[in-house]
């Protein structure tokens, strides 16, 4: 990842002071589709029935307060009422807004599909703590990160935000999390996912953004406004 890209993320941070083609579909364990998760060709992770009538995609940022509100207010109902019985599948695609967001995304994705959703939800729960630390870091200290080798930039960002200790407390030993944070290919993938989102969806207006069966849903950023759209797509 180039210096100019990291600096762009740092400037934003300062302002903030079906299953995958790679994975064969299987029936749900114990009749619960929330136990079925896979990676997707778009770089996201999908939870639920790959043959669900309604396929929901969320573009989310881990430092976005509206995304956190959706996670807390809407995801429990989304999972329990719609994903579990197989009516809706839910794909989450990271859309990174800043350096802290990218760091958190690398940690959430570190163990692949099996732990992505639990880690993502835990990061949202604790967002005020770790993002608060990142946003409170002096600008001069953040800018020094860009002078580090690419393999060390996000390891250092994790320490500033307390995400190194957070990862260890959530089952990712330092050796594992540091390996993921130093993976330049994973960083490049997240950057390309941002590009793909805006390239494929000209009306993309920030996070959270939702697609229902491939179509962008305009003017929807909360569970209260999304659920009626899901019901309509289900024919209810």
Provide a role label for each language-model segment.
Residues 2-3, 211, 228:
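Intrinsically disordered, low-complexity peptide-like regions
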Residues 65, 188, 228:
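Alpha-helical elements of the RecA-like P-loop NTPase motor core of helicases
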Residues 79-80, 227, 231:
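Solvent-exposed, non-membrane alpha-helical residues enriched in polar/charged side chains
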Residues 96-206, 211-215, 220-224, 232-235:
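Cysteine-centric redox/oxidoreductase cores and disulfide-bonded domains
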Residues 75, 223-227:
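Amphipathic alpha-helical segments in well-structured domains
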Residues 2-102, 191-200, 235-236:
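Extracytoplasmic thiol/disulfide redox context detector
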């Amino acid at each position: 990842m180039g210096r100019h890209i990291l600096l762009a993320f740092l400037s934003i941070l300062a302002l903030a002071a079906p299953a995958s083609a790679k994975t064969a579909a299987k029936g749900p364990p114990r009749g619960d589709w929330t136990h079925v998760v896979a990676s997707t060709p778009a770089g996201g992770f999908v939870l639920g029935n790959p043959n669900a009538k309604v396929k929901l995609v969320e573009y989310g940022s881990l430092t976005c307060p509206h995304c956190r509100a959706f996670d807390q207010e809407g995801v429990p109902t989304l999972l329990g009422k719609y994903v579990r019985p197989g009516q809706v599948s839910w794909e989450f695609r990271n859309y990174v807004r800043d350096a802290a967001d990218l760091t958190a995304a690398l940690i959430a994705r570190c163990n692949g599909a099996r732990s992505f959703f639990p880690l993502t939800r835990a990061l949202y729960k604790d967002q005020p703590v770790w993002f608060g630390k990142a946003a409170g870091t002096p600008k001069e200290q953040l800018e020094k990160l860009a002078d580090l080798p690419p393999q060390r930039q996000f390891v250092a960002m994790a320490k500033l935000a307390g995400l190194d200790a957070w990862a260890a407390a959530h089952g990712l030993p330092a050796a594992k999390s540091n390996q993921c944070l130093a993976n330049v290919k994973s960083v490049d993938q997240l950057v390309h996912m941002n590009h793909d989102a805006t390239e494929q969806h000209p009306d993309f207006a920030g996070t959270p953004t939702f697609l229902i069966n491939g179509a962008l849903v305009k003017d929807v950023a909360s569970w209260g406004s999304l659920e009626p759209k899901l019901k309509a797509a289900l024919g209810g």
